[in-house]
């Protein structure tokens, strides 16, 4: 009973005074990333492709970094219905949500929204185990679900993901040699207000603490090293703290 009351309260907070938006996006050649959480504690990132008649996508939990497939549709311009599928195509979960005109978390202020914020529930296929879901759009890039990083010449997205996750985990666990080996040299960093060129791993290790400050390590740790934004200069971790090349190695450190 207490769990049911808690869910209802959470849904009320997320949905109070939020009018349904009209999301009419049809862009089959674009990937739209959303960040958010299930039950306000399980961090997720979702990528959606808005086709003419259906929605396809993937999402993953920040704690697992493993894609779960999605397939569904938009009804009446605002209701988003998605099936979560396993590798065999069996439905393992369902998302019933709405695009809303106002962000219940206030990220967009008083702006009237269309496809930017999704609010609803995730549940098991039989409708049990319902939990709230909230997602906010982070950005979009040209590509497909099977070739996200084509803009930088990548044929296998997992090459970038493996490199990004190796670097990300190494920074979090202070494995300095692995961090140093994850970079493409020469590379430039900001030290003491000046741009410094690092010729190889030894240069980075000698200046490691000055480069990877506590604040910089924290920003990297909060970012999600999968299904990242991409442009011609590389795949972007977080808000641009780190950039990766087609080989999965770090090409830029924005440590300023």
Language-model features and meaning:
Residues 3-14:
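Bacterial N-terminal signal peptides
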Residues 140-169:
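Short, low-complexity N-terminal intrinsically disordered segments enriched in polar/charged residues
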Residues 58, 189-195:
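A short gly/proline-enriched turn/hairpin at secondary-structure junctions
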Residues 15-21:
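Boundary at the C-terminal end of the N-terminal hydrophobic targeting segment
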Residues 75-78, 195-244:
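Surface-exposed, charged secondary-structure patches
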Residues 175-186:
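Short, well-ordered alpha-helical segments enriched in acidic and aromatic residues
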Residues 126-144, 234-256:
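Short beta-strand edge/turn micro-motifs at domain boundaries
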Residues 22-114, 118-134, 148:
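Central antiparallel beta-sheet cores of small beta-barrel/beta-sandwich binding domains
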């Amino acid at each position: 009973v207490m769990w049911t009351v808690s869910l209802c309260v959470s849904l009320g907070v997320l949905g109070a005074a939020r009018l349904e938006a009209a999301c009419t996006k049809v862009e089959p050649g674009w990937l739209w990333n959303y960040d958010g959480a299930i039950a306000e504690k399980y961090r997720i990132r979702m990528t959606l492709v808005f086709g003419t008649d259906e929605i396809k996508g993937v999402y993953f939990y920040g704690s697992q970094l493993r894609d779960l497939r999605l397939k569904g549709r938009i009804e009446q311009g605002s209701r988003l219905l998605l099936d979560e599928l396993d590798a065999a195509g069996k439905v393992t979960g369902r998302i019933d949500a709405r695009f809303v005109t106002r962000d219940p978390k206030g990220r967009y202020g008083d702006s009237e929204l269309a496809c930017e914020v999704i609010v609803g529930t995730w549940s098991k296929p039989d409708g049990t185990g319902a939990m709230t879901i909230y997602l906010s759009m982070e950005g979009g890039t040209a590509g497909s679900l099977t070739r996200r990083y084509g803009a930088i010449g990548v044929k296998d997205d997992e090459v970038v993901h493996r490199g990004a996750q190796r670097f990300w985990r190494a920074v979090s666990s202070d494995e300095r040699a692995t961090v140093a080996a994850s970079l493409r040299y020469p590379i430039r960093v900001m030290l003491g207000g000046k741009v410094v060129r690092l010729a190889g791993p030894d240069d980075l290790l000698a200046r490691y603490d000055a480069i990877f400050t506590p604040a910089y390590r924290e920003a990297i740790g909060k970012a999600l090293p999968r299904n990242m934004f991409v442009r011609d200069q590389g795949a972007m971790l977080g808000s641009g703290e780190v950039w990766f090349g087609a080989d999965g190695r770090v090409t830029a450190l924005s440590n300023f």
